[in-house]
A protein has these predicted regions:
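Acidic/His- and Gly-rich active-site-bordering loop/insert found
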Residues: 3-104
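Fold-level recognition of mixed alpha/beta catalytic cores in primary-metabolism enzymes, strongest
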Residues: 135-225, 237
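Active-site-adjacent substrate-binding region
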Residues: 224-227, 231-247, 396-439
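A short beta-alpha structural unit
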Residues: 17-21, 250-252, 261-263, 294-305, ...
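His/Asp/Glu-rich mid-to-C-terminal helical/loop segments that flank catalytic regions of hydrolases
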Residues: 222-239, 268, 313-320, 328-331, ...
Length: 478
């Protein structure tokens, strides 16, 4: 049953709800891509769908706007799929269960995907509305932004004529983003060897963390469960003979992990004492930002052999010594994170432990330096680092007619000026700016809270205001 069908603007919320009914996590975008194509076909709109499942939909200028420069509307169709503990929904095949409470839209037990589904819905609503006035529109819907911006990277931009772009992938109403960090994914691989070891098998878990976006919320002082797990294992290694069996935590490299687990072979009494000690320490250290943090242990079973002594120590050393979090603040823009990294995914295979980092910096040489630091540390441990999904930063344009227009429209509508700022998170604007020289771009969006977590929510009133702003901006683009 429709939950949002009575909300205005009806087109925006209808398309958003239709999108939420289609599974569309990163890497699972074929169905939603085809849905967008069907939308274009039904309205006689020209479109392009590439092999990556990116979709570009074109709409001609309305009367009186034929000579105006085309405008690009841009958002990504994939979402981060995260669930609260105990949620049984299979997000690969099931749609979301939307919840409307007052002004707030959320999804029961899962991420909402307002990042960036609301951009998709707003662009579709504009393409669908014959009553609006606007220049020629080129609406770009990219795939796999959340896992490395692979859609934007692979899109053939030769089909585009526009050189001004409204990117609707920001989460704070009243803030226009005009510059962002570049980034890359760094995958650390540590080979391991297994051998028998006589000790009880135990499960040690660090859970209950808040998590969040590894760019936008890296400065919130929230703990990383995998890094804390390393601290627990290091403390246990100092008390007793320890053999790691496996370590795991996190699902996305761009999300701060909320829980991590290790299987170990060790003395149960020592493990109980260390876990109690570290639980108390973490509760004190993170009482403000992660008040529900818990360190626990219990007996466990596994068919896996433990790691040998050398491999076990290397794993503990890796989790203890690898850098994580903020590495430098910007000297140019007070309060802006310049360089950071986040250990987002930790997994163990039969013969290797893998740690995937999201590395970000607004200074390209700082980003490369941090990757090199990871590489040097891993090589000392006998491991290696590979990088992929690298994307450029988006440089600030001192002269931006589009920014000036958007600031004026916002000020006229709201009665005060918006904030214009740079962010530490990555945006596809950087890739498009590199591929379309001279591109004039502004990023904005409605209020979305706690994106990339199962607590994600979206403000209805904020969507209404932002959509009205976009419609008015298009009207003024003569």
């Amino acid at each position: 049953m429709a939950v949002l069908n009575h909300l205005e603007p009806q087109r925006v919320f209808r398309f958003f709800e239709e999108l939420c009914a289609i599974p569309h996590g990163s890497g699972n975008t074929k169905a939603v891509s085809d849905w967008l194509v069907d939308f274009a076909k039904a309205r006689g709109l020209r479109y392009v769908q590439d092999q990556l499942n990116n979709v570009v939909i074109f709409r001609d200028a309305t009367p009186g706007y034929e000579s105006a420069e085309p405008v690009i509307l841009q958002g990504h169709m994939d979402m981060v799929c995260e669930k609260e503990p105990g949620c049984t929904k299979d997000m690969a095949v099931e749609g979301l269960d939307l919840v409307l409470e007052g002004d707030t839209v959320s999804a029961r037990g899962t991420t909402l995907g307002g990042d960036d589904g609301i951009a998709v819905a707003m662009a579709m609503a504009i393409l669908d509305d014959d009553s609006l006035s606007h220049p020629a529109i080129e609406a770009i819907f990219t795939v796999d932004e959340e896992t490395g911006m692979y859609g934007a990277e692979g899109l053939d931009v030769s089909v585009l004529k526009g050189r001004r772009m409204l990117n609707m992938d920001s989460e704070d109403e009243g803030i226009f983003t005009v510059s962002c960090a570049g980034g890359a994914r760094a995958d650390c691989c540590l080979p391991i060897t297994r051998s028998a070891f006589s000790a009880p098998v135990l499960e040690i878990a660090v859970t209950g963390l808040v998590g969040g976006h590894s760019g936008a919320e890296i400065d919130k002082g929230r703990a990383n469960s995998s890094m804390l797990l390393g601290r627990v294992l290091c403390a246990l290694e100092e008390k007793t003979d320890l053999r790691v069996i496996s370590v795991c935590g996190g699902l996305k490299d761009n999300a701060i992990p909320t829980g991590s687990v290790a299987l170990v072979a060790a003395d149960a009494g020592a493990a109980q004492a260390v876990c109690a000690e570290m639980d108390a320490a973490f509760k004190k250290e993170y009482r403000v930002n992660d008040p529900a943090i818990t360190v626990s242990f219990r007996p466990a079973e596994t068919a896996l052999l433990p790691l040998d002594e050398s491999s076990s120590r290397s794993v503990v050393c890796m989790l203890t010594c690898l850098p994580n979090g903020i590495q430098a603040m910007s000297a140019d823009m007070p309060g802006l994170v310049q360089t950071s990294l986040n250990l987002g995914i930790l997994t163990t295979g039969d013969d290797a432990v893998h740690a995937s980092f999201s590395v970000r910096s607004s200074v390209a040489t700082q980003k490369q330096m941090l990757i090199q630091r990871l590489r040097c540390l891993m090589e000392r441990l006998g491991g290696s680092v590979s990088t992929h999904g690298e994307y450029p930063g988006w440089e600030y344009m001192p002269q931006s007619p589009l920014r000036d227009l958007m600031v004026q429209v916002f000020t006229d509508q709201y009665g005060y000026a918006p904030k214009v700022e740079a962010i530490h998170a990555g945006l596809e604007c950087g890739l498009f700016s590199a591929k379309l020289p001279g591109l004039d771009c502004v990023s904005f969006g409605p209020d979305l809270k706690e994106i990339h977590t199962f607590r994600e929510s979206m403000s209805v009133a904020s969507v209404q205001r932002v959509y009205a702003m976009v419609v008015e901006a298009l009207k003024r683009m003569h």
